[in-house]
């Protein structure tokens, strides 16, 4: 298969994808999520949960996967950043500091570290991190958006229809399940995993994105970058 779209259970999808499709040589399968930044442009966050604790060298494969993904959806030179607790190269735990040095040596457009507060500002196209911190960032973005919008709706019960529609649009923008779902990268064909309660629109979005990845040679790009 050139690509797979499913709404099955996450664990089963991970195991079956690795067993049936096989892993790309030298890469650790990861979960990525395509979010929207404040300007409505794609922002790829990876890893989002497949690898809880990553060695510095694994960040290099994450960066290659993110670079290939963004190029496959039309970004000629995607900007890649490393999630940390400060923008300076010296910030972060030892694994992150070593990863920062390693990413600077790769043939990618690596901008350096990025703080969570800058994640959605539009200053980067790809955020690389381990699965533990990526999952926390993902759920924090979604949770804060829901909490803020819920409070606004409570404080503005008689808001005009246009305002209510705008709030609903913002809620959906920061809920990755409505944008499609998680993407398993690092196997021999990209796998997109939607939420079990995904709507028809979400499934359509996943199918269209998968078609774009396959038509633009995503897997071939990754294999070439990692040789």
Which functions belong to the PLM regions below?
Residues 9-12, 19, 87-88, 132-135:
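Short glycine-rich anion-binding loops that position phosphate/pyrophosphate groups of nucleotides
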Residues 50-52, 84-89, 116-118, 130-134, ...:
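Glycine-rich beta-alpha junction loops
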Residues 52-116, 125-126:
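Glycine-rich phosphate/diphosphate-binding loop of Rossmann-like nucleotide-binding domains
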Residues 3-6, 44-51, 79-86, 190-194:
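Short glycine-rich or small-residue beta-strand-to-loop segments that form or flank ligand, phosphate
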Residues 3-7, 46, 109-114, 129, ...:
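General beta-strand structural signal in soluble alpha/beta enzymes
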Residues 13-17, 63-66, 99, 203, ...:
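Buried hydrophobic packing segments
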Residues 18-45, 123-127, 131-226:
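Glycine-rich phosphate/nucleotide-binding loop
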Residues 2-3, 7-58, 62:
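Glycine/threonine-rich beta-strand-loop-alpha-helix active-site module
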